[in-house]
Amino acid sequence: MDVIVFHHALGLTPGVQAFADRLGAAGHRVMVPDLYQGETFDSIEAGVAHAEATGFDTIIDRGVAAAAALDDRFVTIGFSLGVLPAQNLAQTHSKAVGAVLCHAAIPLGTFADTWPGGVALQMHNAPDDSWGDFEEAEALVEAVPGAELFVYDTSAHLVTEPSLPDHHPAIADQILERTLTLLASVS
């Protein structure tokens, strides 16, 4: 299965690349576009400031442009900020067959009024994560038949990012395993 992974506000960190590499080791063809064009940040706040200065529409456009290189059906994966292009593609691209949205959610209606039939949705979020848009995740899962919401007992945001104190290896491993399950189900 082709997979396109979109990084969080820190940029294309070694942690994001390592997650993608683990998907590749499981036999998937993985693309990890750099939406920040080489820049990385040490804090969420600095990364968000960069994203705001760049423009969220520009970040989405870069993600959509990267997906043009995919020749086959694909699954999008987005971590926090990366949910913007991931969800956009899942809702609007004819070759998207699934989305894994981690640590964020965008309201239905932002990119399209409905979730397309036949596009699987898996979400990973924590109610106590102040950056995580948990209520939006619940609303999206409620609106999409067959969607899954995995809830984690933490207030940390980027639990999958090893370079941060928020990193939670056990949760990161659960997210990876559940992602692999979704990929197997749509392959």
Residue ranges and their predicted role:
Residues L70-F79:
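Alpha/beta-hydrolase fold nucleophile elbow
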Residues M123-N125:
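Short beta-strand/loop motif that positions the catalytic acidic residue
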Residues M1-D71, V159:
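Serine-hydrolase catalytic machinery in alpha/beta-hydrolase-like enzymes
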Residues F19, G132-E142:
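Short alpha-helix in the alpha/beta-hydrolase fold that links the catalytic acid
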Residues A147-S187:
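C-terminal catalytic histidine-bearing segment of alpha/beta-hydrolase fold enzymes
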Residues W115-L121, P145-G146:
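Short, proline-enriched alpha-helix->beta-strand connector loops that line the catalytic pocket
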Residues K95-A105:
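A conserved short beta-strand
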Residues G78-G82, A86:
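Gly/Ala-rich beta-loop-alpha elbow adjacent to hydrolase catalytic centers
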